[in-house]
Amino acid sequence: MNRLSKEQQVQVVAALVEGNSIRATVRLTGVAKNTVVKLLLDLADVCAAYHDKIVRNLRVRRLQCDEIWQYVGAKAKNVSLEKKAIGWGDVWTRTALDADTKLCVSYLVGGRDLGWAKEFMEDCASRIRNRVQITTDGHKAYLEAVENAFGADIDYAQLQKIYGAVNENETRYSPARCIGCDMKVVSGDPDPKHVSTSFVERQNLSMRMSIRRFTRLTNAFSKKIENHAAAVALWFMYYNFCRVHQTLRVTPAMESGIADHVWSIEEMCTLLPMEGSATKKADKALLLKALGGDDSRQAVVPF
């Protein structure tokens, strides 16, 4: 990446956020594989730190939360204890979406247990300044996590999908057909008309189509948890600040008031410290500190 021009950086990032794998990006741009990965990791660091600093003090009326599954290295049932220790196995990306502005308020790459749910909801609560209506799926961990983060100052409902019977002799990859939904009011007085996870589930689909690592039934899955988390951080920066939403006609960041123009991918790349600088590592550490992170991927891209 030391010799990449700004134009080459833009080409690489554009390929990555539009559904191309690392190797496909190499073929499209002519940039070496290790250079592509290094650019992904370095840019993801500062993008995650920028999101953490800027996406705060939001006025949100309706928040939809969901999680999307993928795996690193292999599915959990096929992972040895040795590989599990380095991050292989099932991994969940939790997402909180503002139903009005379509802004991704918070995201977290990690497990699906209560500890991760609490961390996710606490992060959501720290970014919102008003009483909010939240809808999640029926995952039990959210019951305690939401109460722990928001207390009683919330209107919260769960939407539990009801699936049809599955033929025992039928092999399926996807869940059975959804035949209905059951709404459960957990706290406060949520408006039944707005108890929904449709927008955040549609955002999950955008992730599946735009991040190659999330594509089902391929060998494009992540081999390292660090690269997986970096791809998510890069995508959400692009989604919030660069990608014009079809129904809004502006970016989610503009609609929510935290940006005043559509970012270009080149503008994203300018977040990186200047290439070729003898003090690049120090520059990066100072930049991350200014943005609210530090020189550690674990701190700015939790996984």
Task: Identify the meaning behind each predicted range.
Residues M1-F303:
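Residue-level recognition of single "structural anchor" positions
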